[in-house]
Curated annotation (Swiss-Prot):
This is Acetyl-coenzyme A carboxylase carboxyl transferase subunit alpha. InterPro entries: Acetyl_CoA_COase_a_su, ClpP/crotonase-like_dom_sf, COA_CT_C. Component of the acetyl coenzyme A carboxylase (ACC) complex. First, biotin carboxylase catalyzes the carboxylation of biotin on its carrier protein (BCCP) and then the CO(2) group is transferred by the carboxyltransferase to acetyl-CoA to form malonyl-CoA. Gene3D superfamilies: 2-enoyl-CoA Hydratase, Chain A, domain 1 (3.90.226.10). Pfam families: ACCA. Acetyl-CoA carboxylase is a heterohexamer composed of biotin carboxyl carrier protein (AccB), biotin carboxylase (AccC) and two subunits each of ACCase subunit alpha (AccA) and ACCase subunit beta (AccD). Pathway: Lipid metabolism; malonyl-CoA biosynthesis; malonyl-CoA from acetyl-CoA: step 1/1. Its EC number is 2.1.3.15. HAMAP family: AcetylCoA_CT_alpha.
């Protein structure tokens, strides 16, 4: 896979370009009387070392860029890599099927679970079809329908959060966007089955919270979770989106800060360079965390599960 490098990764990109050039030359003329392999090996080691150095000291704005990386794995990528027998379910049974939310039944190590997550899309047509991962009310109503189905069949619910936010269009507001989000928040707090939520990319405002009320809330290492985007915050406070890096630092949008505030439970480490560098390894780490969380929640009674979830929600906002 050809990698897209972000601005802060340009030194790495330059090294990788040299490696690609040398590799191409080696393929074109195998009779060259020079040892290219040794030079390629040296450059690869240098690239890994440089990547470690850069990623050891990322700021919040750089993490925000990684969370939005166009090659970052999405919900359906993790479904393919970490689950078996996925059967997608569609529609809210009232208005439409919102493609920005995907959901269905799958097996996690043989155990039936309900999966619900945002899906952004990669190519232009798919991005438009999925509305860039910004759900309308029917998307959240579909999610709630699947959660209620999971409760009826006593299946754990696993959600994957990756959205810039709920769709703010006029049509969405006319169809009750705020009501749909509020209803999900209420009903998720009452569910009688375990709910595990994981932020895999962007966790944008109420659009993220509408599938983010759970017994366990995890974040991938280079994901973000915030009430507004850094650009939106900067536009309000400084009247300029150019102040987004400053806003990102001030807002505390990254996983370590949110864990410090006890808003999330676990940070799932990503492969060196981010989840897009090795989706298979990332999926394996995510799967291990989900299995661990399920084991922790399985021992709780229904009453204990709901009481614990309630206490968790009521503790937000206290230092």
């Amino acid at each position: 896979m050809s990698l897209n490098f972000l601005d802060f990764e340009q030194p790495i990109a330059e090294l990788e370009a040299k490696i690609d050039s040398l590799t191409a030359v080696s393929r074109q003329d195998e009779k060259l009387d020079i040892n290219i392999d040794e030079e390629v090996h040296r450059l690869r080691e240098k690239s890994v070392e440089l990547t470690r150095k850069i990623f050891a000291d990322l700021g919040a704005w750089q993490v925000a860029q990684l969370a939005r990386h166009p090659q970052r794995p999405y919900t359906l990528d993790y479904v393919r890599l970490a689950f078996d027998e996925f059967d997608e379910l569609a529609g809210d049974r009232a208005y439409a099927d919102d493609k920005a939310i995907v959901g269905g039944i799958a097996r996690l190590e043989g155990r039936p679970v309900m999966i619900i997550g945002h899906q952004k899309g990669r190519e232009t047509k798919e991005k438009i079809r999925r509305n860039f991962g910004m759900p309308a009310p029917e998307g959240y109503r579909k999610a709630l329908r699947l959660m209620e189905m999971a409760e009826r069949f006593n299946m754990p619910i696993i959600t994957f959060i990756d959205t810039p936010g709920a769709y703010p269009g006029v049509g969405a507001e006319e169809r009750g966007q705020s009501e749909a989000i509020a209803r999900n928040l209420r009903e998720m707090s009452r569910l009688n089955v375990p709910v595990i939520c994981t932020v895999i990319g962007e966790g944008g405002s109420g659009g993220a919270l509408a599938i983010g009320v759970g017994d366990k809330v995890n974040m991938l290492q280079y994901s973000t979770y915030s009430v507004i985007s850094p650009e939106g915050c900067a536009s309000i406070l400084w009247k300029s989106a150019n102040k987004a890096p400053l806003a990102a630092e001030a807002m505390g949008i990254i996983a370590p800060r949110l864990k410090e505030l006890k808003l999330i439970d676990s940070i799932i480490p990503e492969p060196l360079g981010g989840a897009h560098r090795n989706p298979e390894a990332m999926a394996a780490s995510l799967k291990a965390q989900l299995l661990e969380d399920l084991a922790d929640l399985d021992v709780l009674s229904t009453d204990d599960l709901k009481n614990r979830r309630y206490q968790r929600l009521m503790s937000y906002g206290y230092a």
